[in-house]
A protein has these predicted regions:
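HIT superfamily nucleotide-processing domains
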Residues: 1-113
């Protein structure tokens, strides 16, 4: 999508420090971290909501989810980690491009609201 910041990051049209990249997605550090280690896994294909996903998109998301544990050392996930996907304004989705928050590096409680 032409005006999507995350599409620009993923496609190399806007400068960002990529921690990891493959054919499916990139990983960057969150600019407003909510944990000691806070990364974003951003699919290169644009879609905003899980409900918009095709079967192909579902396979893409599965590949991303299978890759994240393999990045354990790079992302410092050793003590455990949390994955979050916000869907919609009320959930805190601030960028209209589906992405996965990867949080680690500290003991986390459960305070979703």
């Amino acid at each position: 999508m032409e005006d999507c910041l995350f599409c620009k990051f993923a496609n190399g049209d806007s400068a960002v420090n990529k921690v990891f990249e493959n054919d499916d997605f990139i990983v960057i550090r969150d600019i407003n971290p909510q944990a000691k280690n806070h990364f974003l896994a951003i699919p290169k294909k644009h879609f905003k909501y899980l409900a918009e996903m095709t079967e192909e998109d579902s396979a893409l998301l599965a590949r991303i989810l299978k890759t994240i544990p393999k990045l354990s050392d790079l992302l410092e996930l050793g003590g455990g980690y949390r994955l979050v996907i916000n869907q919609g304004d009320d959930a805190g989705q601030t960028v209209p491009h589906l992405h996965i928050h990867i949080l680690s590096g500290q003991k986390m409680g459960w305070q979703p609201a």
